[in-house]
Amino acid sequence: LQRRRQRQMCIRDRFTAILVTVINLCFCYPIAFYMAKVASPGTSRLLIISLIIPFWINELLRSFALRILFAGEGVINNVLLGTGLIDTGINFIAQDVALYTGLTYAYILLMIFPLYNAIESLDSNQLEAAKDLGSSTIRTHWRIVIPHAKAGIASGCTMVFMLTAGALATPVVLSSPNTYWFTQLIYQWFNMNDNWSRGSAYSILLLTISVTFVLLMMRIFKVKIGEIIR
C-alpha cells in the first residue's frame, strides 16, 4: 500500500511538472517575442532588468511572500472580498493555486531567456515578408517563429521540467498540508530515516525520469543536445 502511494505521488508530481512547464511556455512565449521583435532596445533592456531583479531574493523568501499573498486572509483574498467579486475567501493553498503559481514564477527566467535568444536571431525580414503575403499572426508564428525557436523551446522546457520535478523549498512552503512532494520523500529517507540506499534509489528514479524527458524533448522538436545547451 505504501509503495502504491509512493508511485501515485511520483506520477502526480511528474504530471505537475509537465503542467507547470506548459503553463510557463504559454506565458513566456509572448513575452519573449515582444522583447525580441516588438519592443525597442531600451524597453527590452528595461523588461530584462525588471525580470531579473526579483530573483536577487532567495527562492525560499519569494515562496513565503507568495504564501502571504495567497493566504486565507492574504492580499488577494482581501482585494477580491473588498471588490465584491467573492463572498467568502478562497483557499488557494488547499487548491494548489499557490503551488502552481509559485513553481511557474520560480523558473520563469529559464523559459524566457532561451526563447528570447532563439527568437532574437530570427531575421525580421521573414516576418515582414509573411505579413506582406497576407499571412495571419497565428500562421506566421506557427510556420516561421516556432520552427526557428524550437531549440530555445526545447531548452526552456527541459530546464523548467527538471527543476520543477526536483523542487523542494517551493512545494514545502506553498502546498497544502495534505500534499506530499516526491522530493520531500527523498529528503525524508536521507535526513530523517537515515536510509541512504532507499533515498539513493528514489533519487536515481527521479534522475531517470528527467533524462527521459530531455530525450523526449529532443525527439519532439528534432534538436540535438548541443542545440539545447547552447
Each model region followed by its residue ranges:
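Transmembrane-helix boundary motif in ABC transporter permease subunits
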Residues: 19-52, 68, 126-127, 141, ...
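Hydrophobic alpha-helical transmembrane segments of multipass integral membrane proteins
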Residues: 15-27, 31, 57, 142, ...
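Membrane-interfacial helix termini and adjacent extracytoplasmic/periplasmic loops
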Residues: 63-104, 138, 174-178
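Transmembrane alpha-helices
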Residues: 53, 105, 111-119, 123-124, ...
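Interhelical loop and adjacent transmembrane-helix boundary motif
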Residues: 8, 171-218
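Transmembrane alpha-helices and adjacent helix-loop boundaries
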Residues: 56-63
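C-terminal transmembrane helix and the adjacent membrane-cytosol boundary/short C-terminal tail
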Residues: 116-131, 200-230
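Single conserved hydrophobic/aromatic residue that forms the stacking wall/gate
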Residues: 1-11
